Amino acid sequence: MNAKEKIEELLEASEDGTITAAQVTEAGLHRSVLQEFVKSGEMYRFGRGLYVRSSAWEDDFYLLQRKYGRGIYSHDTALYLLGYSDRTPAKYTMTFPKGYNAPSLKQENLIIKRVVPENYEFGRIEIESPSGNPIRVYDLERTLCDILRGSGSDIQTVSYTHLRAHETEA
């Protein structure tokens, strides 16, 4: 099996059209093979070590979380993903544990929140992105608390969201 066939096999196994440089190395291939795929237009580089098949449906929520594995969608982005807001956020909000530092985070179109490591996992759930891929997000209760605790929150929006959530549960 040649390098191209191995890459194709890895992409087929991934189901989402993504592949990492680490997977290529584990398969016994040199990472330069990925650059050949990028040059030919069959793939593009989404971030450091993360490559996506050009024909794959691009899911920003999923790809950003693959790129920043410690990030959890929170605040207004979580409200949107949980179905309690009809406004697509202009910038996605992700929460990271304090001490996590990825220099490229500042270059993304993200609002970055930090939390002490003891509270980082609290309220974390896994849901499907709008494109059907698994993503991590904070649950509704954690999201509402985070929004209320933050500065400049719109109390009417949060109250409306909370009431709407309880109406759907009843």
Please report, for each region that a protein language model flagged, where it lies by residue.
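Short amphipathic alpha-helical interface segments
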Residues: N2-G17
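Short amphipathic alpha-helical interaction segments
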Residues: L29-E36
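Nucleic-acid-binding surface
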Residues: T18-Q23, F46, L50-Q156
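Single conserved hydrophobic/aromatic residue that forms the stacking wall/gate
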Residues: H162-A170
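Alpha-helical residues within the helix-turn-helix
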Residues: E26
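A small-molecule sensor/coupling module
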Residues: S159
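Glycine-centered, phosphate/nucleic-acid-interacting loop/turn motifs that mediate DNA/RNA or nucleotide
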Residues: G41
